[in-house]
Curated annotation (Swiss-Prot):
GO cellular component terms listed in the entry, alphabetical order: plasma membrane
Key word NADP present: no
Name assigned to this protein: Undecaprenyl-diphosphatase
Function: Catalyzes the dephosphorylation of undecaprenyl diphosphate (UPP). Confers resistance to bacitracin.
GO MF annotation list: undecaprenyl-diphosphatase activity
Gene name linked to the record: uppP
């Protein structure tokens, strides 16, 4: 196990793919930063970064878990959105929700394109990951304390969607957490904890799917991180799907009566541990 930096131009082993896919599935939907965990586990056990492209592609498996878990909600929103486009009299809340997801996706889409090189190179520094794990935990605690948690799902507005979309941009930095960023934003907007969590999942779908498909060619490029075969990416995505589905069900049950501050209690010691290991290395 090593935190030393090595030449990334290597191919991934099956053990790496399986372990990292399980880590991805476990952490993608929890506010602990899946990209941060993948970065830490890769460096700790194999001494090298699996790469942002590999991470983005296996996220497709966990996003498929979201599509399956929320299939009824997604279908209802999509049908209402298309019906509303054709007939103004059918523009109900689900129609507006379709536009809210689109509006909330635009900020992270623009940030991802404009900051692509910065994200894949500078932001993947382990010192940054460890520091952000600690600092953003304080944001969780503040959001829990300041948020009134009184607003329901049908009280969501376009402004809420854009604000949570801006919070989602922070997730481009390993250590923040996509769900942690958007849910914190929702809590600051006084949304109920479960409402913020559910909208966070819906908001992530287009952004993560686009990121994964866009990064697919780079996942086979050793210069973009460790190279993985097509079969490895397929198996990794499958593992991420199964583990991710279980994680979604657990998180929704957990947030109904538990504070997000519990995740801060995990993130802070983890960040300190990584810093200690980096210092020793």
């Amino acid at each position: 196990m090593s935190f030393a930096m090595t030449d990334p131009a290597t191919t991934m082993s099956w053990v790496q793919v399986i372990v990292l896919s399980i880590v991805q599935g476990l952490t993608e939907f929890l506010p602990v930063s899946s990209s941060g965990h993948l970065r830490i586990v890769s460096q700790l056990f194999w001494g090298e970064d699996a790469g942002a492209s590999f991470t983005a592609v296996i996220q497709l498996g966990t996003e498929l878990a979201v599509l399956v878990f929320f299939a009824k909600d997604i279908w209802r929103i999509l049908t209402a959105w298309f019906a509303g486009l054709a007939d103004k009299s059918k523009r109900n809340f689900d129609y507006r929700m379709g536009w809210m997801v689109i509006a909330g996706t635009i900020p992270v889409g623009l940030a991802g394109v404009l900051l692509k090189d910065l994200i894949r190179e500078n932001f993947r520094n382990l010192w940054i990951t460890a520091t952000v794990l600690i600092l953003f935990s304080l944001v969780f605690i503040l959001a829990e304390r300041r948020g009134k948690k009184t607003r329901g799902f049908e009280e969501l507005t376009m402004k809420d969607a854009v604000v949570m979309g801006l919070w989602q941009c922070l997730a481009l930095i390993p250590g923040v957490s996509r769900s942690g960023g958007t849910i914190s934003g929702g809590l600051f907007l006084n949304l109920d904890r479960e409402v913020a969590t559910r909208f966070s999942f819906l908001l992530a779908i287009p952004a993560v799917l686009a990121s994964g498909l866009f990064s697919l060619p780079d996942a086979f490029d050793p210069q973009a991180g460790q190279a993985a075969s097509g079969l490895q990416l397929l198996v990794g995505s499958g593992i991420g799907f199964v583990v991710g589905y279980i994680s979604i069900a657990w998180l929704l049950k957990f947030v109904s009566n538990h504070s997000f501050a519990w995740f801060a209690a995990y993130r802070i010691p983890l960040g300190l541990l990584v810093m200690a290991l980096l210092g020793l290395a």
